[in-house]
Amino acid sequence: MSYALLRPFLFNMDPEHAHEMTLSLLDKAHKARVLGLVYGQSMQPTDCMGLQFSNPVGLAAGLDKNGDYIDALAELGFGFIEVGTVTPKPQVGNDRPRLFRLKQADAIINRMGFNNEGVDYLIENVKRCKYKGNIGINIGKNAATPVEQAADDYVYCLERVYPHASYITVNISSPNTKNLRDLQSGEALTHLLDAIKNRHSQLATEYGFYVPLVLKVAPDLDPLQVDYISQQLLDFEIDGLIATNTTLSRVGVEDLPDGDQAGGLSGRPVSHISTQILQQFSDQLDGKVALIGVGGIDSGAKAVKKIEAGADMVQLYSGLIYKGPGLVQSCIQSIGGYYDAMEN
């Protein structure tokens, strides 16, 4: 069944239940060995952060929080998969309802709150999967951990996931964990990166191989914050930046049903602001840090906009919900066409 036929049925369901059902259906199709026949794999080889990717279009964190569906999702043609956000201990997240569709705007508001089964559960899934591509693991802190002790949670997760991840993303930008975004500023960011980078260097020595470190930031940053974060990335030799997470802004959706729900807004309305922030980081970092663009990509043209703004690679999430799995190949082909045109 095509996604266009399935979507009306899914969109009449509770969003979180529909999310779970979609992943279950994908898993069944994967086990029946039909997904690869339908979607295949487009090649657009990309080198980034010292890693080789089959193509520059990845899955953003949040869709497969626990790594339960890596093999099924990989068959949609992604060049890399990011799982998580995962925390040291399992946690249920915020109360339901916590996921809302804004259909008129092709948008989603979520206040999930890092619901996950804990880092050890995720690691077992990563170890068990057959996918041979790059897997990023996105780490966060437990809601019960005071923000002043956040570094302890991040370092704990870093230690656990290090031998199993292709790269590790430090998520300090979710709006749904109290005070988490405070870690994006001032001494809090410096202290966090110092603790993470010190342990990261030790782990690289202990294991004898290097796993790139990535920071994921919010779109709700002013120019001074962009400048400060950029300098911290350079000072601590962080390998990559994901721009961006969801926004607290409600511009363009404030009058829509559920447009005033608390949480982070993703999808089409965040496209412009996230691309602006990406461009600002690109200007500041001047190619010294790898950039992954995410936010509002619902077409191949939008993916190219991220590349034009300085992204080395892109990630999808909300666009998949509204446009379906065919969006992956569309983005790969559009980015490939863009690079071909640049060379001619």
From Swiss-Prot:
Its cofactor is FMN. Transmembrane segments: none annotated. The keyword Lipoprotein does not apply. Keywords: Cell membrane, Flavoprotein, FMN, Membrane, Oxidoreductase, Pyrimidine biosynthesis. It is a peripheral membrane protein. Pathway: Pyrimidine metabolism; UMP biosynthesis via de novo pathway; orotate from (S)-dihydroorotate (quinone route): step 1/1. The keyword Membrane applies. It is found in: Cell membrane. FMN binds at residues 61-65, 85, 138, 171, 216, 244, 267, 296, 317-318. The active site is at 174 (nucleophile). Its main location: membrane. It comes from the Bacteria. GO terms for biological process: 'de novo' pyrimidine nucleobase biosynthetic process; 'de novo' UMP biosynthetic process. It holds the Pfam family DHO_dh. HAMAP family: DHO_dh_type2. Monomer. Belongs to the dihydroorotate dehydrogenase family. Type 2 subfamily. This is Dihydroorotate dehydrogenase (quinone). It comes from Psychrobacter arcticus (strain DSM 17307 / VKM B-2377 / 273-4).
